[in-house]
Amino acid sequence: MIDWGYRAQRLAYRAASALGLVQSQTRRPPASKGTAGLRQQVIHFINKPMPGGLPKRTSRALLDVEDKRIVPLIRDPQKAGDDAEAVFYFPGCGSERLFGQVGLATQAMLYEVGSICVLPPGYLCCGYPQTAAGEQEAGQKIITDNRVLFHRVANTLNYLDIRTVVVSCGTCMDQLMQYQFDKIFPGCRLLDIHEYLLEKGVQLDGLSGTRYMYHDPCHTPMKTYQ
């Protein structure tokens, strides 16, 4: 459904471009004292094309770990020995189903730094969309079901002594802060993948003189390091 919606939006963008309706992204918006008219709203919606070329398969499908009866453990045996740090990675809907390349990249980085990446069994939603939409009961049920499942994972893998829960989505971060993970994995903390990589000393080499701009999203995942 999302794929077809994106296709329709990109088609509308191309049609608007041909008609000269698309505005420059650097153009100063006109002054307004009230609600934008329908024409302005439509132009704003199609003024920039939605992304295309989304992954056809999720990272779980690519790694053949979709079975919700198993708890996947991903590690590099050459780097992750018996004393390697284990982290619990919660991908969420966005990083797993919608933009699967984000989830795959996160797992690849954990693999690269020599950590053991523990994934939840099966596809899971954090419950934020339901709660934000006013479906409090549905959202609370998801939270409760997930916490019960995570307790089972913690008990099964207690020998790994998981002390870090990693996320790659700021919205999931906000929701998971309500999960009381310190009572699931005793003594654990909740970190964004970038904060975790910062702790591991991961850097980009050969970028002298290159400047970057970082956009901090509304649901910022940076809760520990500023």
Predicted regions mapped to residue ranges:
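Iron-sulfur cluster-binding electron-transfer modules in prokaryotic oxidoreductases
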Residues: 1-226
